Amino acid sequence: MVRITKVHTGGGDEGETSLVDGSRVAKSNARIEIVGTCDEVNALLGMVLMETNRISDTHADGGTRITVRRVKDVCTSAIGRLQSELFDLGAELACPPNQIPEYMQLIDQEDSDRLCEEMDAWIEELDPLESFILPTGSGPVATLHLARTVTRRLERSMVGIKDEMRPLSLQYVNRLSDWLFVLTRWTSARLAEDETLWTPKGKREAGTADMIRRQNANR
């Protein structure tokens, strides 16, 4: 059981911090950057839960909005698990190369495969993609998009020192970004939101100047 009685130690005042084994490294160290990005993903997932819980799951007449309740249940369960897994991953990533303590509980193949199983279940409920999706939507959907992009940044950072970490950790993060993409689409569909699709340049409007002029003319 973790017991923390003091947070401020002054040990990081000069730009250094400790790895799990107590060794000191600069806060600009690539491994510390990775740990921080992992924490950033976790915080964004917390924001997804906040945004999801803001959506009313009752109709004006008091009846239950079944699809909204389902989104809340799935996100609370899945993201709650993911946040703990990311904490496990962050602890592992904060270890020096090839010096993971035997007592540490690590992300395993079952955790990684579970992401694929959940993706497959969600995809069964979705229409096939016919274009790229632009990152927009309501609070939970837009925040899921952001979490996905930060997860990709985490993956890119990990690749930079992949020889110093377990291949399974990198596999897990790669799958996690895909998982977030599919959950974003599933959440959008369950909330009856239209996805904003990419429009090729030849089909896009040239600008908004004409629209502004028409609006001004109709005042």
Language-model features: where?
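Phosphate/pyrophosphate-binding loop motifs in nucleotide- or prenyl diphosphate-using proteins
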Residues: 1-219
